[in-house]
Amino acid sequence: MSAQQTRAPLLRRIAPYGAAGLAAIVGVAIWSGTGSQSGADASRTPANAVAADGASAAVRQAALPASAALPAPLVGSSAPRLPLDSGGHLAKVRAVRDFFDYCLTARSELTAAALDALVAREIAAQLDATPAQPEALDVWRRYRAYLDALEKLPDGGAVDKIDPEALQRALDQRASIAHRTLGDWSQPFFGAEQSQQRYDLARLRIVQDRTLTDAQKAERLAALDQQMPADERAARAPAERQRAALDQIAQLQKSGATPDAVRAQLTQSLGADVAARVVQMQQDDASWQSRYADYAAQRAQIDAAGLSQQDRDAQIAALRQRIFTKPGEAVRAAAFDRSAAGTR
């Protein structure tokens, strides 16, 4: 198989990870106050607390040793606040997941141990020596178990988004994994999202129903919209903004828009700073994907050389270190190697 033939299936496997990274960076934009959420409950809008705590966050970061500096994707930002209940314990609300998702924006830049250390530092910066600190660390371990389980799914859990039955199976599978790994945190973390996905699936079934006329479809879609409580619609607004931004990015990518064109379009909806970060992340991810495909082609040549297992592993490890020079990149490549081996 030629290097070009090797690259195509590899890029298809890598693509969902790039999309996840873009989702994370857009999520950071929303949490940082891109969209107006005035008057909303603080537990739903950690960005409000972040703004109020901006000065103390800056002091905390200045006090960190150089080895604890924020990774590049998080530079210039602050973590969402971890909410507490009236008893001083970690509140079971979606904002806790927002905090972890913020940290996960830097996942591609860090080893697993470094990511754990980053999360532990960010938790300590807010909850040091409080009952909520070990609670937050425990929830992080559960969330990591959930994400690790998703990565073990075929193709990272990617699914045909226009096949209702495939979507239903995927939603049921993810819900089962969330319940198993997160326990009673499954509902605050994913309850609203799962409800939105079920709603979207119901809409898709209506749209694809060939037995209905256009008028009947419109009537049923309107009825479906009316079934959603007003407060639930308001709570879903941030997710809708994120989804709209991701759809916009996907359309721009599909049209082959240049980075400058992408930045110009996203500036209108997300603001100049976030648009620039999205474009930079796209470029970084595209560069990584290209280098991984080149690396995989060279790794295949090593595999075909008939070396002993020890020599093969040593040469592949050296190849990774030579091609992937930034922190965490070689570890990420090794993880993709394991994923690729599992699908063969």
Swiss-Prot record:
One of the record's GO cellular component terms: plasma membrane
Cell inner membrane listed as a keyword: yes
Keyword Signal: no
Pfam families recorded: Lipase_chap (PF03280)
Compartments reported by the entry: Cell inner membrane
Any Gene Ontology biological process: protein folding
Membrane topology: Single-pass membrane protein
InterPro entries tied to this protein: Lipase_chaperone
Keywords: Cell inner membrane, Cell membrane, Chaperone, Lipid degradation, Lipid metabolism, Membrane, Transmembrane, Transmembrane helix
Chief location: membrane
Residue stretches spanning the membrane: 13-35
GO terms of molecular function: unfolded protein binding
Cited function: May be involved in the folding of the extracellular lipase during its passage through the periplasm.
Family the UniProt entry places it in: Belongs to the lipase chaperone family.
Protein name: Lipase chaperone
Source species of the chain: Burkholderia vietnamiensis (strain G4 / LMG 22486) (Burkholderia cepacia (strain R1808))
Gene encoding the protein: lifO
